[in-house]
Amino acid sequence: MMAELKNKEHYRKILCLLIPLGGVAFLLWYIKNSTCDVVYSDYIRLVNSYLPDVYDPRRFFVPDVLTRIPINYLERIINVELFGFSITFDRVLGAVSLGLAAWAFGVYFIRRRLGTVWFLLTMAVMFSLNKWEMITNGSGWSHFFAFACFYYHELVFDRVWAGEEKRGDTLQLILLPFLIILGTAGPYCAIYAVVMILSAAAGILRARIRKEGSSARRYLVFLFSSLIPLLLYILSNSFAVEEHAGATGRSLGALLADAPSFPVRFILKSLAGMVIGGEELIQWIEKGQMTDNICYLLGLFVAAGYLWALWLYLRHRLYERTLFPLMLLTGGALNHVLIFLSRYIFEKENYALSSRYALQFQVGILGIILTFALVSKAKEKVYPAGRAFMALFCIAILLGNGYTTYREIKKAPYREERFEQMEQLAPLMPFLSDEEMMEMEPAVPDLYEYRKGTDQIRNAFRILEENGLNVFRKPAS
């Protein structure tokens, strides 16, 4: 009997480590079948800002360097020197980074001995193509890597919280926030830092209740280890010059005076986009196949999932054993608020459905699933209606994300076709006039998704041509 249990545990561990590999392989297949290796969108700005001399210290030692994500400088040097500034290389890094995040959850599932079915559901969310825009735009690779780092840091903290500390964990909890916030997190550091600060504050409170003075002092060190790099990032960010094309310029107060329900509608749509991809929801609404009110109801359903998970977490005192699910729930909820505060200036509630935010929003969904898994494993008493809601929520998330991924796979050839069009026209870009660019169908700024000046597009491709990079790179003989 014991041997059988050990074998079962062994196979479960293997699955928790191998399934993320399958997820990475799936993303690589998707990248291969939906993209081409051509500069576009934000890469045009990056080429004009940092190429051809990726070693130029003047491009690094700038007041707002932390907002530019320092790890990108190292990656850019490697990319230019070894791969000729390949966008595909960045996309692969993004897929691998998402795999690292999945492995972090695999470690948690192994440690907590949670069921494989729950892990499969978690992986379905993790590798869902509701993040297609981030996956295909390789410049976001560092964001995937940042979230893998967030999860790892939270797991180390959770280990200490649960009394399962390993050698070196204290040092990691002091150093990790500096490395993550100052090195790779960029604008995503705000919610991560707040979650870690709140977690450390919870540790201080618990230590004082238990009258453990040394433990309280240690958590205080953890708190300042997150606060100090956050303040440094905020200082660096104060020197950044931000452009918001399309912003109305109205203050939040003016917006609320005219449309007091706008924040609620925006956040409900951002929640709804975690069941079914935002692009699908927008298309349904535009075609009249779904009303805005149905979308809001879908958002309320997800909000109910948050509240039910939080209630279960507190009701069954899961915080005595693990803090990780609560960290995820808090981070997910705060991300919805943060996106509203940063995007209300456009006064378009459908902005909440952009796939570029799915990476942030899915944090909360993962927290909900983990909470349900922990309650289910512990065989805690839950009313039948509550269990039915848990089942309904998980089925909805699985089917919704599955449908979104299916639809995105169907769209992959059309996305690839658009990239191929960019690739074919790229050699012409350095020589086209503004009029010629605008006369094309679609116009060059629309095709390359860069609308900050045709001169910027022309100059970026001229730099690439002169230095034999990206589409102008000569094949190795």
Describe the predicted segments one by one.
Residues 109-129, 147-148:
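Transmembrane-helix signature of polytopic, membrane-embedded enzymes
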Residues 168-199:
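Membrane-interface alpha helices of multi-pass inner-membrane proteins
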Residues 27-30, 129-136, 181-184, 231-236, ...:
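Transmembrane-helix signature of polytopic, lipid-linked glycan biosynthesis machinery
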Residues 23, 119-126, 222-231, 317-345:
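Transmembrane alpha-helix segments characteristic
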Residues 37, 89-93, 131-142, 353-357:
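Membrane-embedded glycan-lipid processing machinery
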Residues 135, 142-146, 349-373:
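Hydrophobic/aromatic-rich transmembrane helices and adjacent perimembrane loops
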Residues 3-76, 80-118, 164, 196-226, ...:
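Intrinsically disordered, polar/acidic, low-complexity terminal segments
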Residues 142-165, 197, 203, 364-367:
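Specific aromatic-rich, kink-prone transmembrane helix
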